Amino acid sequence: MPELLIENEGRVLRVNGQRFHAIWLRDNVQDGQRPAALATLPANLGLSAAVLRGDSLEITFAPEDKTAVFALQWLKDHAYDTPQERSEGHIPANCTPWGAGFASAVPAAPLPALLAYEATKYSWLDAIRSFGFAKVTELVDREAAFRDVVALFAPLCELQQDQAMSSHGQHPATAAPYREPVPSLKLLTNLNPSLGGEIILVDGFACALRLMQEDPEGFTALTAHSNRFADTSRQGEALHSRRQIIELLPEGTLQTIRFNPRFAAPVTDVLFDRMETYYRAYRRFAELVDSPEMQITLPLAAGEALLLDNTRVLQGRKSSESENACQFQSCFAQKDRLLSALAALEASL
């Protein structure tokens, strides 16, 4: 019979010698009730009961009094209490962190001016490099909007439709973290502005710097260990990636933020003794992302589009009061093309 022990005042479950943290188990419930936002879980989350049911384990979480069932084989396959070898930020040059106060200074430029004047184009591209996003206004032809904007610096890569039901908003997140490489630029427009659906933006670099100031140990945990992301929702596709939530260059410069709990797979690349620290930082990062002081909210009116750095800026949506679905259209491009165009303009101006 499997050995079952609840330890550390309910924070740890031991199964056949393998230890699992309560918060890790709660984050990986197998009944479709994975928390939409990690920050909403109780800070004093623990285990009140664990009962063997055949080849499965029934666990009760406190203080939620929520029961979840885990297959023993699944726990064995995802065990992280095993010896693993491990070894061990500053903002990149030309980048400026921002928070809610930046809402009154959103960079924007009209498309005709971007096409006509290299100085305007340079300032607009430089704003994306500095702040991670910028608006385009005065888009006349909706069908050609993406082609015209992306053609300012790169070939169009990929077009997709994105719909959001009116009754639900979307927590800020980076797009497609399961892709490798992750799409680095995202261009977004609202096809029906009259239905609402304001955009929420968060500077992931600013959140990372804040976490580093508050909890250096937790910051190191998120930069030194991989998270896993997966999307198997489409038939014939199984997309997976394995990267840090906060990725640094070898010299310590902030490089990429990958944060999207919707596509997070079980964390198994963190030592048992580091898992609580990891989740403490993961949870705090989620709280910062959801904090109004780190967010700006802006509408996308008719004839407007938003280009954002998907390796830095987290994007969400506010819920709409309309009974109809808001409809957004987006496409991806690669940031190296933008930086190349920017460098060429810097050399010529």
Predicted features by range, described:
Residues 10-12, 92-123, 129-133, 138-139, ...:
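Active-site environment of non-heme Fe oxygenases that use a 2-His-1-carboxylate facial triad
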Residues 1-126:
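Fe(II)/2-oxoglutarate
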